[in-house]
């Protein structure tokens, strides 16, 4: 999740303060912005243009949340177990060594969106997270109304979504959630959506040998795929459900592998809000998922 008004205050242009009265000339005091402050994201609820989407943007719209912090996004901080974050260019420059020191074991990083956009911070984030010793993976923000699942899987696999057995690379993620630019299900029927997702999965697996992880909410999956269970035996499931003690899993999946439990987390090395996530298992199981030995 990107930062909103709080970061706008810290990331604005330097302010000049004029002092008068006792001095003949005004004294300008420049307030420098925070070095790693993230850029200001478009407010949820408005159309999100190409390249601007991020993990959770549709979830905010689905839950009727505005631009500022909300108790449903803050929620109880579940800091137990194996912890991680997800990021995009909206988080700005990230100190990945500090993220590791803050106790984060894994990270998912936005790589692509549709078939025309590669996140401009992906390469730096992906490399620096690896060098910091964080197990990381890439995610693709789906635009099912723009092109086929096959075409988008190809674009993702060719632009950061690849996989290798190196102890630090997780399988890629298909981020498919409430359309941030229009109708919830992108104008597709449940049958069309199932086909789109299945095509994406099939092509991604053909390109990488891995089953793509699916990120979404219970509401979106039940509504837009008709509670489809066709991916349950194939894809690890990542559920977004903020501000609760336990997530609701859609009818089509028996359990969750990852849980995005907050969109307003704070982690050393990241300026402003960042999505917080939990892995459903031990550190050894996370490594097994990364290396495809689970």
Swiss-Prot record:
Location of the protein in the cell: Secreted
Gene Ontology molecular function: lysozyme activity
Keyword Disulfide bond attributed: yes
Coiled-coil annotated spans: none
Disulphide-bridged cysteine pairs: 185-224
Record-level GO cellular component terms: extracellular region
Location of the Ch-type lysozyme domain: 81-294
UniProt GO BP: carbohydrate catabolic process; cell wall macromolecule catabolic process; defense response to bacterium; killing of cells of another organism; peptidoglycan catabolic process
Catalytic activity: Hydrolysis of (1->4)-beta-linkages between N-acetylmuramic acid and N-acetyl-D-glucosamine residues in a peptidoglycan and between N-acetyl-D-glucosamine residues in chitodextrins
Keywords: Antimicrobial, Bacteriolytic enzyme, Disulfide bond, Glycosidase, Hydrolase, Secreted, Signal
Keyword match Secreted: yes
Annotated Pfam families: Glyco_hydro_25
EC number(s) on file: 3.2.1.17
Catalytic residues as annotated in Swiss-Prot or TrEMBL: 86, 175, 177
Cited function: This enzyme has both lysozyme (acetylmuramidase) and diacetylmuramidase activities.
Similarity comment: Belongs to the glycosyl hydrolase 25 family.
Name used for this protein in its record: Lysozyme M1
UniProt organism field: Streptomyces globisporus
Lineage of source species: Bacteria, Bacillati, Actinomycetota, Actinomycetes, Kitasatosporales
Recorded name of the encoding gene: acm
